[in-house]
Amino acid sequence: MAVGNINELPENILLELFTHVPARQLLLNCRLVCSLWRDLIDLVTLWKRKCLREGFITEDWDQPVADWKIFYFLRSLHRNLLHNPCAEEGFEFWSLDVNGGDEWKVEDLSRDQRKEFPNDQVKKYFVTSYYTCLKSQVVDLKAEGYWEELMDTTRPDIEVKDWFAARPDCGSKYQLCVQLLSSAHAPLGTFQPDPATIQQKSDAKWREVSHTFSNYPPGVRYIWFQHGGVDTHYWAGWYGPRVTNSSITIGPPLP
């Protein structure tokens, strides 16, 4: 039997059609068409289907979700918000705040180092010198797709990670500071662990530092990330801590 009006289709068919429509178009356009479409687009079922279809959850997903629509958007936006975290583009996107000694430098991970590093996609790192070297990056959340209401109402977890290592032949000191900033760049949350001092003749293994911001105040619009360090023997060259594979992610990770 021919259907003259799309609204005459069974609701389950309409829901299936909506799973193929981009999420922003559903909310900004389709939801305004009529009350039927609005009610269908607001159904939990639709957003669970979209999550499943796009691989954001698995068939056997059993974890509680407070709001499937928000969950979908957080999953779709989930990625590393720091650009050029592994020095593949030199110092592009980074601000060299303090460039002491022989200044910041990019080096390649050796074949042995690649075997030891937990991510085989990482091939380069940034290295510091005999006077303090610090570099930073500011993440503009709105520019990255995280609108103000989402950040203020949902306040999703913000996870920060960084990797650092010393040289086996020289001691070094590594430092990290991450701040959640308001629209006026006032700090609303800070993670600044004590500097990590690594002694000479250490194992030179790569170490991960991580922190999750939760239940922070509303108003977060930017994230400021700064790291670096210095060697503790003041040797000419690049004997300070090495850093790479830094990341800032928001919301639940992909399965």
From Swiss-Prot:
Key word Transmembrane helix present: no
GO biological process: ERAD pathway; glycoprotein catabolic process; proteasomal protein catabolic process; SCF-dependent proteasomal ubiquitin-dependent protein catabolic process
Tissues where this protein is expressed: Abundantly expressed in brain and kidney. Expressed at lower levels in heart, spleen and liver.
Domain F-box positions: 3-50
Pfam families (alphabetical): F-box-like, FBA
GO CC list: cytoplasm; cytosol; SCF ubiquitin ligase complex
InterPro entries (alphabetical): F-box-assoc_dom (IPR007397), F-box-like_dom_sf (IPR036047), F-box_dom (IPR001810), F-box_only (IPR039752), Galactose-bd-like_sf (IPR008979)
Signal peptide interval: none
Residue ranges of every copy of the FBA domain listed in the record: 71-252
UniProt keyword annotation of Transmembrane helix present: no
PROSITE patterns for the chain: FBA, FBOX
Keywords annotated in UniProt: Ubl conjugation pathway
Miscellaneous: In contrast to other FBA domain containing proteins, FBXO44 demonstrates no significant binding to any of the 200 glycans tested.
Subunit organization: Part of a SCF (SKP1-cullin-F-box) protein ligase complex. Interacts with SKP1 and CUL1.
Function of the molecule: Substrate-recognition component of the SCF (SKP1-CUL1-F-box protein)-type E3 ubiquitin ligase complex.
Name the record gives this protein: F-box only protein 44
Species of provenance: Homo sapiens
Gene expressing this chain: FBXO44
